[in-house]
Amino acid sequence: MQVTTEAVSGVARRLNVSVPTSRINEQFEARLKRTAKTVKINGFRPGKVPANVVRREYGASIYQEVVNDIIRDSVFEAIQQEKINAVGMPNIEKVEHKEDALVFEATVEVYPEVEVKAFDGLEVERKTAEIKDADVDTMIENLQKQRQTWAVTKGMAKKDMQVTFDFEGSIDGEKFEGGSAEDFKLVLGSGRMIPGFEDGIIGMKAGEEKVIDVTFPEDYQAENLAGKAAQFKITVKQVEKPKLPEIDAEFLKIFGVSEEEGIEKLKADVRKNMEREVRNGLRNQVKQAAFDALVAANEIEVPAAMVAQEIDRQRQQMVQQFTQQFGGAGAQSFDKSMLPDELFKEQAERSVKLGVLVSKVLADAKLEVDQARVDAYIDDMASSYEDPTEVIEYFKNDAQQRAQIEAVVLEDQVVDHILASAKVTDKAVSYEDLLKEQQARRMG
């Protein structure tokens, strides 16, 4: 077999393969003999069919099978012979039967060979944040709000109060589907209703009626209502103000704090959890910034096959999240056509490029996972659980789970390696702003 290779692009190679006709003939004759031993043809006993009859009846199909098998086998032999780091399946083209050889072309995508630019040209913003006493107080207040109750008031409805009311909507004097409800509960300021609706209720008292004018957003999900002006008749039945629980023995007990330890122990525990959250948030932020800079500075071409695989992975991940959120029944009714390739393509391309670049950085720097950092990472994560020892043992005994942590730590080591040479600018942010940024990153 003869093979020549030419570069089609940075990530594709064209193989010109020539297979001697003798190889095809040998395999054809051998398969013809095997077929003659098993084929059943009327008028002949099994295994006694003459070779010329088998050749006449099955020769063409057997020959095509042999050719297909030889093309398949020889293209992979050629890839191995030429030491090509192939990704995805080869594409067979221009098959030609010559007198002395079977000749064909095969195009195959290859893993990118890249050179990473020096890190000293990268600019990375590294954010810093400190937990202040006011942040801890706000967090404890949030814990109280999560367990708040409601107390009826005769006063006016204000933001953060809960209102029970009836409403009846109309457009040009005509009622519309879904525009009415009774005993509807709404926390003012929650943003559950269309713009202007909640503002119209603020200031009302129990027993009052009012008609408010609002306009449905242009992008409202119900197309028959989008952009239209509507009137809602509001009848307030009850106004309730939030009542926070006292920070007493019962409240402290919820968080594993005794009455003797008191509020200071709760504050210390809350601060510890917040500091862990900040560490993780800052680590993720600088990792994102460093990797963004790395990808932006290194324009590389990646194989479509790798991008397609990453698209499939991200799509499957989204389906799994949908299944976890809505259960098996919801997953069965889920239409995957709602998740076209284009939805994931941009992120998938970035992910593949980043993976190639990070792998190259690891190889060039000869980085290996720091097991001490892995243990420290697990210890830090386990400290948020009721029984840290159990969590530590879990990761110690589950190789697959530990491997996932090792991958995260190895990425952190790559980031440290980049930051050691990059132009890093530190920027202090508040705890609140850091949380908002984390939430925005999770949302997309």
UniProtKB/Swiss-Prot annotation:
InterPro entries: PPIase_dom_sf, PPIase_FKBP_dom, Trig_fac, Trigger_fac_C, Trigger_fac_C_sf, Trigger_fac_ribosome-bd_bac, Trigger_fac_ribosome-bd_sf, Trigger_fact/SurA_dom_sf. Gene3D superfamilies: 3.10.50.40, Trigger factor ribosome-binding domain (3.30.70.1050), Trigger factor, C-terminal domain (1.10.3120.10). SUPFAM superfamilies: FKBP-like, Triger factor/SurA peptide-binding domain-like, Trigger factor ribosome-binding domain. Its EC number is 5.2.1.8. Disulfide bonds: none annotated. Consists of 3 domains; the N-terminus binds the ribosome, the middle domain has PPIase activity, while the C-terminus has intrinsic chaperone activity on its own. This is Trigger factor. It comes from Acinetobacter baumannii (strain ATCC 17978 / DSM 105126 / CIP 53.77 / LMG 1025 / NCDC KC755 / 5377).
